Design a protein with these regions (language model features):
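Q-loop/switch helix immediately C-terminal to the Walker
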Residues: 6-18, 30
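Hydrophobic anchor residue at the start of the ABC signature
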Residues: 62-63
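ABC ATPase C-loop
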Residues: 66-67
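Conserved catalytic motifs of ABC-family nucleotide-binding domains
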Residues: 70
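Walker B catalytic motif
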Residues: 78-79, 86
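Conserved catalytic loops of ABC-family nucleotide-binding domains
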Residues: 94-108, 116-118
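Conserved beta-strand-loop-alpha-helix hinge in the C-terminal portion
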Residues: 123, 127, 131-154
Length: 155
């Protein structure tokens, strides 16, 4: 056990970020609303931070932090990795909520374009061996879905 609960961690981080004391009632309501959006059981907020969560629960917990802390830049690395279809939809809905309401930037690193389907994509970059070899708009995602990554493996 970590003795730090998810709820406590998020509230403390939010207070550090804003420099203001967060009223418990306001925080609790926002946390409950956000957890409901992510289809998370309210009891998760009382669990130890990052202890005993399944893979899908960890991913949802990451998106919960994203939505509660509203960073100006978030890097999501393989957020869809290992998720079933329903969990991908839920995580995508959380990311979509961030795009609509948080006015921040996202860098989403993924091998699967499924998570991108419901999101607004401004730029798409293809990396091979740590180098960006092609940049485009959302249509590049469609191109990759149609033809795969094979052409990039030859580069």
């Amino acid at each position: 056990a970590s003795d730090v609960y998810k709820r406590q961690f998020i509230r403390n981080a939010l207070e550090q970020k804003t420099g203001k004391r967060i009223r418990l009632w306001d925080f609790k309501k926002e946390l409950e609303r956000t957890m409901e959006l992510l289809q998370m059981d309210p009891s998760y907020a009382e669990r130890d931070l990052n202890v005993g969560f399944s893979g899908g629960e960890k991913k949802k917990a990451e998106i919960l932090q994203l939505l509660m802390l509203k960073p100006s830049l978030a890097i999501l690395d393989e957020t869809d990795s290992g998720l079933d279809v329903d969990a991908v939809r839920t995580v995508s809905a959380g990311i979509e909520e961030y795009q609509k309401n948080c006015k921040g930037s996202l860098l989403i690193i993924t091998h699967s374009t499924k998570i991108l389907e419901s999101l607004t994509v401004d730029y798409t970059h293809v990396m091979v061996e740590g180098k960006i070899i092609e940049t485009g708009d959302a249509s590049l995602v469609d191109k990759i879905n149609e033809s795969g990554f094979a052409e990039y493996e030859r580069i």
